[in-house]
Amino acid sequence: MRRLLWLLLPSGVLALDLGSKAWVLSFLREGETHRVIDGFFNLSVGFNRGAIFGSLIWLPEGIRFGLFTLAGLAALVYFGRIFLARDTRPFDRVGLGMILGGALGNGLDRWFHGHVVDFLDFVFGTWHYWTFNVADSFILVGAVLYGIGLLRHPSASGAVAAPKP
């Protein structure tokens, strides 16, 4: 029962991601921008047909689709197995839940639409950050949390601890 309760985290992340994408697409189309905080934050819809930051866009669509599908399924099985394991620490489970929910959101986008919807657009002075989405945010925060967990308890993750001097 406790493991089922933990499924609420990735499910919630998935709902936030898909809901936010549906919301922004209800009033903006690809290439359109709505300024929220002038000179700092925009809603700017872009369709990422490549991998992270638009990489691998040069590959033919069929190869990209197969590659992303296999990589996504492998990651879901790997992280899902750790997430549901009885001995996974709660801190690690939070990070993994964020990663899983975000990966599912972007994966479903790619599976059903052939691209990932990105729309969060930040500008810092002359620096314009990549456009991203809610799923990307949760994946990043989840990876940081999971990484902290691995550093704090390397043997629990299956990683080999450094020898003591």
Language-model segments: what does each one mean?
Residues 1-165:
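Alpha-helical transmembrane bundles and membrane-interface segments of multipass inner-membrane proteins
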